[in-house]
């Protein structure tokens, strides 16, 4: 049945690409040779031999759409939205590889005005953010839903 083969993913450019890369990582679809997070891919680019019905919705609605979907459906849900929906990340069938192309491309960054990058307070902030204490906090607090890539 088609409804049992639905995969719900975020519709915005960056998260759609990330979702499709994850689905390819898990062998559910194929993307064009050399597809990567920086170039961006959409559902129009995929090879879908399994016949999944891939539905794109706003990222902040994926968890709710998934909760209301038929048995057998899958969803690719951003960690922050999965947490907000009360989902147990440890039960995820797949997670994005923290060292992978998508995670590295879409990681949060510290951006400062040009010329301020070497200010002592900026350097102190960067050092603190990259500390083992912060990494441990992220790992303990978010249990895999948010991953420190530093």
What is each of the regions a protein language model found here?
Residues 29-48:
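Short mixed-charge
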Residues 20-22, 43-82:
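Short helices/loops that flank or line small-molecule/ion binding pockets
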